[in-house]
């Protein structure tokens, strides 16, 4: 099925004059339907969510829960596992520092060199506070992800794994279903508990469908609402299994 670029342009005020926008990986432009929905909210509702003090609060609560249902269907999850935050950094910090008590001295965190700083700095803080080691998975000579290196670096001390679904620098896509299988296989071989696997899907979800029911070894998955044409106010979604 074909599509018309000109018809798509009509949905975005910034593109009607012929502009070309190449920074969607940072944040997507907002189509008119999103802008109109925000405008309608402030004109008609604008109440505190989950407040029974007014009909506006009820309507706002309904809108939020409907959105939660939509997101849950989008990634094939239970809506009770969906949490909204205001930024990618907050989402990852919530996941990482929420499990800081499970790590102890000499434990290890496994990251990749493809990670965004938001998925590195919290671990560096944790490493310094808890005296734990951070290991990195490197790339092959052709800059593709090295799954063999990833598998080898999971060991008896690995407690947390942080990994991007797609690099915001190189565009390299990591097969997160394959990652889950490797983690499961390696954990069984070593007879250890499955490490806490946190996936940053902020870039990847814009290019590939995610079914969290196929990712049965993950602890959490984070992605950005504003990169998939949602408003800036609700930036990130955390799926916690």
Please identify what each model-predicted range represents.
Residues 1-241:
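Pyridoxal 5′-phosphate
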């Amino acid at each position: 099925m074909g599509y018309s670029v000109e018809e798509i342009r009509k949905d975005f005020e910034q593109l009607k004059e012929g502009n070309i926008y190449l920074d969607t990986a940072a944040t997507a432009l907002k189509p008119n339907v999103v802008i109109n929905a925000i405008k309608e909210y402030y004109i008609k509702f604008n109440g505190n969510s989950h407040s029974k003090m007014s009909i506006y609060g009820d309507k706002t609560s309904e809108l939020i829960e409907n959105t939660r249902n939509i997101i849950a269907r989008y990634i094939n999850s239970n809506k009770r596992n969906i949490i909204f935050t205001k930024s990618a950094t907050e989402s990852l910090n919530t996941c990482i520092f929420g499990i800081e008590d499970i790590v102890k001295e000499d434990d290890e965190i496994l990251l990749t060199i493809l990670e965004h700083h938001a998925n590195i700095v919290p671990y560096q803080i944790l490493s310094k506070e808890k005296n734990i080691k951070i290991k990195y998975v490197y790339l092959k000579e052709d800059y593709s992800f090295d799954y063999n290196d990833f598998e080898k670096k999971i060991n008896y001390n690995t407690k947390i794994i942080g990994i991007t679904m797609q690099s915001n620098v190189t565009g390299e896509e990591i097969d997160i279903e394959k990652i889950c299988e490797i983690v499961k296989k390696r954990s069984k071989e070593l007879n250890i508990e499955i490490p806490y696997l946190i996936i940053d899907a902020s870039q990847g979800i814009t290019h590939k469908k995610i079914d969290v029911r196929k990712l049965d070894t993950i602890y959490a998955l984070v992605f950005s609402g504003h990169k998939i044409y949602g408003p800036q106010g609700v930036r990130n979604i955390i799926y916690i299994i």
